[in-house]
């Protein structure tokens, strides 16, 4: 018996992985958070399966269902939104599964920040503009941030920030980040990414809070902050496809014999294993 933590993606049922859907189709127990995972995802469960919306349940309630499935020798599809490894609250479930000696597997899903970038039609890592993305949140009613993970510390890097679970904390975010990024730094609020009512608010650190208040957005939103969100045109091309960039799969023009003789003819020097930036 195995518990499968399955990432359903951020909302669009078509974004679940083939493996994730296949496992849902096979499991006799399917547990999902109905407030974050669309029913269309768990509709793939087999006829007669016990499909449970866990949105109103406690951790003890959830583990009791898993224990019952374990006693019956039935696999469990534990379906989470986005990717389970990011703010998925699976660590406490895994801890209890280990205590109960129950096997588990994690099936990755499309994270909300990646789906949002796709919808915005942007690359978040632009050569010499932004090469780092920090995924974080701010502390409000939830658990405190660990020492050293304060927003000020991340702001000092100048990296693109993807701030989760914090749309009601924009006043504090603006206060902390403005000295580092500037009041005119672009900000995008990605609301309910992947759902039919998704939409995006574009602004700056100085203007975005008013736009969010006017739109009455209070939850299920991701905050992007950083210069890469601008329509950047003045940046160098990636080295990966530059005509002068030589690697094992593309030697210098006119000298094909170099392919086999090159000392760099190793797997780590192929395009798939280099960023090209």
Positions of PLM-derived features:
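Class I SAM-dependent methyltransferase SAM-binding "motif I" and its flanking Rossmann-like core
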Residues: 1-3, 83-157, 201-202
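Class I S-adenosyl-L-methionine
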Residues: 1-110, 115
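A generic local structural motif
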Residues: 14-20, 38, 63-65, 121-122, ...
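Structural recognition of alpha->loop->beta junctions
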Residues: 27, 96-103, 127, 209-217
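Residue-level signal for well-ordered alpha-helical positions
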Residues: 43-44, 119, 176
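A contiguous loop/helix-start segment that scaffolds small-molecule binding in enzyme catalytic cores
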Residues: 2-3, 61, 72-76, 132, ...
